[in-house]
């Protein structure tokens, strides 16, 4: 992994090339975030490369790697579980951008209405972009597992499986 470059800017202006790369990375990140509540799997996948891998990285859950095809196949479960899913960046000023490696890290929150009531969670996402910064090539997701477990328990109480307990195949993520 390339080291993160830091530029000390005293006049509040970034060099032209750095600004353009940074702006592209942030624009793609913004698109990624805006697709979460769209309930449109085509829109969600349009921001990703065809080979994008989605790493769900929480040790107390199975560490899954999900492909675009698996996302598409499992999307009906998401639609059936949530009536509304609002997703946004928390503290945008704390978003980390590594222009050299084309990575962005955000802290985000979800506020949703599920078929078993309210659901809220917080996330850390690390997005690895393509060289031109226009598509997401890899996603690393970390989330509050206690809140997700609570949702799963409420779903299980109604005999509904979701997430790691749902019947779909995934692969284990390697760090």
Curated annotation (Swiss-Prot):
Coiled coil: none annotated. Pathway: Secondary metabolite biosynthesis; terpenoid biosynthesis. One of its GO terms (biological process) is terpenoid biosynthetic process. PANTHER family: AUSTINOID BIOSYNTHESIS CLUSTERS PROTEIN F-RELATED, AUSTINOL SYNTHESIS PROTEIN F-RELATED. Part of the gene cluster that mediates the biosynthesis of calidodehydroaustin, a fungal meroterpenoid. The first step of the pathway is the synthesis of 3,5-dimethylorsellinic acid by the polyketide synthase ausA. 3,5-dimethylorsellinic acid is then prenylated by the polyprenyl transferase ausN. Further epoxidation by the FAD-dependent monooxygenase ausM and cyclization by the probable terpene cyclase ausL lead to the formation of protoaustinoid A. Belongs to the trt14 isomerase family. In A.calidoustus, the austinoid gene cluster lies on a contiguous DNA region, while clusters from E.nidulans and P.brasilianum are split in their respective genomes. Genetic rearrangements provoked variability among the clusters and E.nidulans produces the least number of austionoid derivatives with the end products austinol and dehydroaustinol, while P.brasilianum can produce until acetoxydehydroaustin, and A.calidoustus produces the highest number of identified derivatives. Homodimer. This is Austinoid biosynthesis cluster protein F. The gene is ausF.
